[in-house]
Swiss-Prot record:
Keyword Metal-binding belongs to the record: no
Protein name (database record): Protein stum homolog
Keyword Signal: no
Domain of life: Eukaryota
Source taxonomy: Eukaryota, Metazoa, Chordata, Craniata, Vertebrata
Length: 141
């Protein structure tokens, strides 16, 4: 994966500060460090849904593993966006269906149930963060 233009600017700014410091130690003044979470394709396919829908999916995932994830797959077809903008809607839909099947099939050994609950919590967290972005409020999660 190639670094973005912003990453290159951040690295260049950090290198300039390090070069300007005669002691060789880098100073953090004037340098903006951006931290981004790297997500795999299954996790990046979790849709940004309205908060009530995300809470319903969390409850469904809590009581019937994979059901909330299955429902969330259909929100992608209804226009919910994901962190996979370069993938087609059908591909993201099938990624969510695959995540639901993994959760259902591995629920027997409790792994799927735990994964399903965490998946639902991620849906709620994404819904909350999306709400903050739409309102323009700085967020602290």
């Amino acid at each position: 994966m190639e670094p973005s233009h912003k990453d290159a600017e951040t690295a260049a700014a950090a290198a300039a500060v390090a070069a300007a410091d005669p002691r060789g130690a880098s100073s953090s003044s004037g340098v903006v460090v951006q931290v981004r979470e790297k997500k795999g394709p299954l996790r990046a396919a979790i849709p940004y849904m309205p908060f009530p829908v995300a809470v319903i999916c969390l409850f469904l995932n809590t009581f019937v593993p994979g059901l909330g994830t299955f429902v969330s797959a259909f929100t992608v077809l209804c226009g919910a966006r994901t962190d996979l903008p370069d993938r087609h809607v059908c591909c993201v839909f099938w990624l969510n269906i695959a995540a639901a099947l993994i959760q259902i099939l591995t629920a027997i050994v409790m792994v799927g149930w735990i994964m399903s609950i965490f998946w639902g919590m991620d849906m709620v967290i994404l819904a909350i963060s999306q709400g903050y972005k739409e309102q323009g409020i700085p967020q602290q999660l």
